[in-house]
Amino acid sequence: MTIIANQGSHLVPMERLLGIILSLLLVFACSSLSANQQDWELVSDRNDIQVYMKHRDESRLKTFRGVTRFTLKDEYALAALLNDYPSYPKWLHFVDSAEEFDRRGPLDRSLRFTTQLPWPLADREAVLQALVKQTMTADEQSVMIDLVNRPDALPPNNDYIRFPEMTGKLGFRRLGNDQVEMTYELILDPGGYIPAWIANILLRDAPYFTLERLRRMISKPEYQNHYYDYLDLHGPGRPQAAASLGDSQNHQNVTK
């Protein structure tokens, strides 16, 4: 006995109806995947640094990602640089100060950043929790710092407009032969009044200049030959007897 469904004045076999539904679902899924893959738009490609955008120009929420590849023989140099808060204005674009105001352990910290924007724009501040995820498996070897917005962790400061929304990440994955791919991503609402076109120009520059300066900073002598026992990385400062942290580690924050 064939089960049928009534479609207006026509009778459609249930098997055919199910086939139509499954086909529509498959088309929708493929369309969604294609849209997601096309969300990132390349807006700048210079000095081996690619900057991508993922938002409408008029949107309050701005999303930018910078990616670069380079040689990094001492991976602990990145941790050493991130430990050096006074150095942040030298490489983190628009940041003019960075401080740690709370710590739940050596791998979980709360940070405050202030930014100095060109006149007549008001200066901003960000209050963030910095967490790190370290993955060391056969398929992936990476360290990624996640920045989570915590705007209520400190009292308001009348000298700054606090970012109402902000998340980000900074880290690298190994490519082999001491090559790494470094990523810096920002998703934020700048708060207050900033014309959309100005915000787009300013924020588009942030990933580029941050990565360009970071590449130079981590090669400086003061950041070489360090070792942090909470990170399973490569570097000449790592003792030969240092134990591995395991095949896969999830930590919070790459500074100590």
Question: Where do the model's predicted regions map?
Answer:
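Compositionally biased non-globular segments, especially hydrophobic aliphatic-rich helices
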Residues: 5-8, 26, 32
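Bacterial N-terminal signal peptides that target proteins for export
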Residues: 5-21
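Hydrophobic alpha-helical elements and their junctions with loops/disorder across both membrane
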Residues: 9-12, 30, 214
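Bacterial N-terminal signal peptides
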Residues: 19-29
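Eukaryotic helix-grip
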Residues: 33-256
